[in-house]
Regions:
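Pre-Walker A adenine-sensing motif
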Residues: 1-7
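Pre-Walker A (Motif I) flank of P-loop NTPase domains
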Residues: 9-13
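Hydrophobic anchor at the beta1->P-loop junction of P-loop NTPases
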Residues: 16
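The conserved Walker
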Residues: 20
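Conserved lysine of the Walker
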Residues: 24
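Conserved substrate/cofactor phosphate-moiety recognition/catalytic segment
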Residues: 29-71
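Conserved nucleotide-sensing/catalytic segment adjacent to the nucleotide-binding pocket
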Residues: 53-101
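A glycine- and Lys/Arg-enriched "phosphate-lid" helix/loop adjacent to the NTP-binding pocket
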Residues: 97-168, 172-175, 181
């Protein structure tokens, strides 16, 4: 876990990524509370609320909305936790629509190589599935999870995987964030 050089950066964004129903929102909220920092909710939840279907244009609009919401909050804060970012949206897009999107790939690359450092917490789907209207499939979580490490590695992203109980996840995640902040 390479620490962030606070003198030479404009803050830190910690994105919580993983398959659906793998504890991303719970962890983002807990980290925000622990570090007294803001968190950016998953944009797709508001965008898709009350809808029964979506298409590729919707997923790209969600990506743009997630990115803009994150930028607005990050501009005013040194530390920000993000519940889902373009890594999740890229995997969702590629699985759902069967291929890459050049804009999405370029935006993801730009976010990873921006002046503001970005680190990742990858949540393991080792917790029970909880149904809700926006979740699509309780049985594909392991297969989706298997896509994250190779993508994060390919992108050269710095990440820590978290698993286990809420307490174990929070303990591992806070340790990672402290290491990244050099605290």
């Amino acid at each position: 876990m390479a620490p962030i050089d606070a003198k030479n950066c404009s803050g830190l964004t910690v994105a919580i990524v993983g398959a659906e129903c793998s504890g991303k929102t719970t962890l983002a909220r807990a980290l925000a509370q622990h570090f007294a920092a803001p968190w950016v909710p998953e944009y797709a939840r508001d965008y898709l609320h009350g809808r029964t279907s979506y298409d590729e244009d919707d997923v790209l609009a969600i990506a743009a909305g997630q990115r803009q919401t994150e930028a607005n909050i990050a501009d005013a804060n040194d530390l920000v936790f993000v519940d889902t970012d373009l890594v999740v949206i890229k995997i969702w897009h590629d699985v759902r629509f069967g291929g890459h999107n050049a804009w999405l790939d370029a935006a993801l690359h730009a976010d990873l190589h921006a002046d503001r450092p970005r680190r990742y917490l990858l949540t393991t789907p080792d917790i029970p599935w909880i149904a809700d209207p926006l979740r699509e499939n309780p049985f594909d979580r392991p297969a989706l999870h298997a896509r994250y490490r190779p993508l994060l590695d390919l992108l050269g992203a710095k990440y820590v995987e978290v698993s286990g109980s809420r307490e174990q996840r929070l303990d591992r995640a806070t340790g990672a964030v402290r290491g990244w902040l050099n605290r």
